Design a protein with these regions (language model features):
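Conserved nucleotidyltransferase catalytic core and NTase-mimicking acidic/glycine-rich helix/loop elements
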Residues: 350-386
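Generic structural signal for hydrophobic core residues of well-folded globular domains
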Residues: 4-7, 94, 294, 309-312, ...
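Intrinsically disordered or highly flexible coil/loop and linker segments, enriched in small
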Residues: 9, 314-319, 331, 354-362, ...
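Basic, amphipathic alpha-helical segments enriched in Lys/Arg and hydrophobic/aromatic residues
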Residues: 332-358
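Conserved, well-structured functional cores that handle cations and Mg-NTP chemistry
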Residues: 1-303, 374-424
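Short runs of predominantly hydrophobic/aromatic residues within well-ordered alpha helices
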Residues: 287, 302, 315, 341-345
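Short amphipathic alpha-helical "interface-anchor" segments enriched in bulky aromatics
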Residues: 304-332
Length: 424
């Protein structure tokens, strides 16, 4: 999102910038946007018996930027460390698992002075940090109770949503869905004890099971990886056609196993899923492991846990829409407040387009706008925005012609430079 494209001149640019950089007493900031998103999701969804909160981190990559305030480190698509910042976003699905509502946004950087990793916090408590400046920064953040890290940011982000929904409807049931990286015991206990909610989270393949072998020499227990352990229950079912990352697989066999898992004296369920091609080879190198607070006692429930996790594709689709269509990573401001606020505003605007999704296929005007983008009959957020872009471009051209009093003859000559109307 480029502020300059919303401004006719530098004065208007400065006014727009002041609106989001914190210089005004009343400012549109990321916290206000977060509150508005949560309020909207509560009003819309609190009447449901059960909702699914899908949360994930998304890296805002600024590989070639160097002068941005609080420019942190993130990973590119190949896993390399590059410059950028981090966004934690959430969407909520209603009980039908169809309707998407963008529900919360948190923007932070691991270069902020008050960003203190869990390890760094422990080192501070154990007097292992030697940098006096950093010691002072951590102390100030702790004294002010405003230090942040990946763990407490996630906990606050989820608690704000869970508390708001239950305040409106104390009987609502909430299930949180997460990818790998959020399967720690601390996270599971936070969901179970503090929030009183359910969760389905993908487990890292490095996690140990409670099964073990005894080393005959040392007599020590060698715990078996969860992914390699034996599961008490097993079943399978078949899918005639399955499309994964654009590739079609036919006659797929799904092997699904489930068992109990005790972590820190708490009972959880774990589900292992393996997909087989019709020739008997696996589609993925490793099985998928899911940990859940839900008591899995049958194939039906195990299958439901798997399908619940697969809902994550919906938030991935939201992130892709924000980056590819709304230009989430294209901001051109440097101060941290403006960066946070523009990212949050973009998320909020994305929420609007998901709100009107049901209207896109019904409104004749919207259908025509999509056709303008050569949608070939497809009515989507992408083609709607591309059509709007074409309309706005045409409007700018018309206004320009009127302002400069450009004749049809001169306009035809201008078009010729763009190859319009030229025969080859």
């Amino acid at each position: 999102m480029r502020l300059w494209t919303f401004s006719d001149d530098k004065k208007e640019f400065d006014r727009n910038k002041n609106l989001i950089n914190g210089n005004l007493k009343t400012v549109l900031d990321d916290k206000k946007i977060s509150e508005a998103l949560i309020k909207n999701s509560v009003e819309k969804l609190a009447g449901n018996k059960r909702v699914y909160i899908l949360s994930d981190h998304s890296d805002i990559r600024k590989q070639y930027s160097t002068a941005l305030e609080n420019l942190g480190k993130v990973r590119d698509l190949n896993g390399n460390i590059i410059n950028g910042n981090t966004v934690l976003g959430s969407v909520i699905l209603d009980e039908s698992k169809q309707d998407i509502t963008l529900s919360n946004i948190t923007v932070f950087s691991n270069r902020e002075k008050n960003f203190v990793t869990v390890k760094e916090l422990k080192d501070y408590e154990d007097n292992k940090i030697e940098d006096d400046t950093r010691i002072a920064e951590i102390k100030a953040a702790i004294d002010d109770d405003n230090y942040i890290n990946m763990r407490n940011t996630l906990e606050k982000h989820l608690q704000d949503q869970s508390t708001a929904l239950k305040k409106k409807n104390p009987n609502i049931s909430i299930c949180h869905v997460h990818d790998r990286g959020e399967d720690s015991i601390e996270y599971l206990e936070f969901i179970k004890d503090t929030l009183g909610d359910d969760t389905v989270v993908r487990a890292k393949k490095s996690r140990n099971s409670t099964q073990y072998n005894i080393n005959p020499t040392t007599k020590r227990k060698n715990y078996i990886k969860l992914i390699d352990s034996k599961f008490e229950n097993k079943s399978e079912y078949h899918i005639d056609k399955l499309t994964l990352k654009g590739k079609l697989y036919q006659q797929v066999k799904v092997s699904i196993q489930w068992d109990k898992l005790i972590l820190n004296n708490y009972d959880y369920s774990v589900v292992k899923i393996t997909l087989f091609k019709r020739d008997g080879t696996t589609i993925y190198k490793e099985p998928m492991l899911l940990i859940t607070t839900i008591n899995v006692t049958s194939k039906v429930i195990a299958k439901e846990i798997y399908h619940t996790y697969l809902l994550r594709v919906k938030i991935e689709g939201v992130f892709k829409f924000l980056k590819d269509v709304l230009g989430w990573e294209e901001f051109q401001v440097r101060d941290w407040e403006s960066i946070k606020n523009i990212i949050a505003i973009c998320f909020f605007i994305g929420g609007y387009f998901y709100e009107i999704k049901s209207e896109l296929t019904k409104n004749e005007t919207i259908i025509m706008i999509c056709d303008l983008a050569k949608s070939k009959g497809k009515i989507t957020h992408y083609f709607f925005l591309e059509g709007m872009r074409a309309l706005l471009t045409a409007l700018r051209v018309d206004l320009f012609r009127k302002e400069r009093n450009i004749s049809d003859e001169l306009y035809t000559k201008m078009q010729a430079y763009a190859g319009i109307g030229v025969e080859f």
